Amino acid sequence: MNKTSTIRLALVGCGEHAETGHAIPLARYQSEHPYSIALVAACDIRIERAQRFCQRYGFKGSYSNIDELLSREEIDGCIAVVPPERISETGILLLNRHIPCVVEKPLGSVLAEVEELAIKAAESGTPNMVSVNRRFMPFLNRALEWAGNAGSIRYVHCTLARHARSEREFIWATAVHAVDTLRYIAGEVKKFECRTMMAGTAAWYAIDLLFQSGVEGRIDVLPTAGMVEETYHLSGEGFHVSVTCPFGRKRGWVAHRNGALVTEEWAPAEMPEDLVNGCYQETAAFIRALTDRSIPKPSIADVAPSVQICMSIANEQIGR
């Protein structure tokens, strides 16, 4: 690709998640596809963090204010990694300026912010994408391809276990990953029921789902279970697939058919994290959409129902 067709990108927010989930994949993509992208700016309210991203990952300019960045730089896309209470307003700013953007889940800190962002995204017509890396995990997608060839999925299940995560927003800020991934696998949710278990230091959740496709499923959300693991199970007549990713002692996938283990694949210890957890593949998908002028996926409209389910559970828990 020649320099005239280079995609110019900015990153807003330079914290830990921005680094592991976005800066590292962007730098990898640039190194593997010279001249295809330009990392024109990094922005953070703490200017020293933006400057560090410039030094470490090759961003050209550093800013402490998004308005200054947008007034000085010409960009083709922006990745915004900001706290939940800033996601909606930052996303709306970019959408209204018709800058194709990636925003983070959970799209807002309250349901009204999520709904406003979704409305503005539809009204603006600006290409947009939500960072939900599970949809891009190679192990999950290879397992889905295998299951599709094996037969029809009848049941899906996720166990999302964490250690010492007692924050009240866990159900909508983190567990939304599980809901969104099952929607990615099985389609739109027709109805759901949630049982909240209040014993211990944090609420645990058992969420039963019926999908419009007829598939049934369940999510067990265990934020203080003393371990960090995320496992997805896909079951059909005569077959079962298990995917452990992005967290677990041993990450990969296994498939059983007619009582026998037929396929297994595990991540080698030296495999870079962003290649395992889908962050690199997500980054590549956004860049590809900008390059091809196609519609990025998943969009705000695609992911908003996942957030709405989780926030409705949280609101019911506190009696709203």
Give the residues covered by each predicted segment:
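C-terminal helix-rich "cap/oligomerization" subdomain common to oxidoreductases
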Residues: 1-6, 77-82, 126, 285-320
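Active-site loop of classical SDR/Rossmann-like NAD(P)-dependent oxidoreductases
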Residues: 17, 45, 270-284, 298
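Contiguous beta-strand/loop segments that form the cofactor/metal-binding neighborhood of enzyme cores
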Residues: 173-249, 280-294
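Mid-domain beta-loop-alpha active-site segment that forms a flexible
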Residues: 131-138, 160-192, 302-303
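Hydrophobic residues in well-ordered beta-strands that form the structural core
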Residues: 103, 128-130, 243
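N-terminal Rossmann-like dinucleotide-binding module
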Residues: 1-57
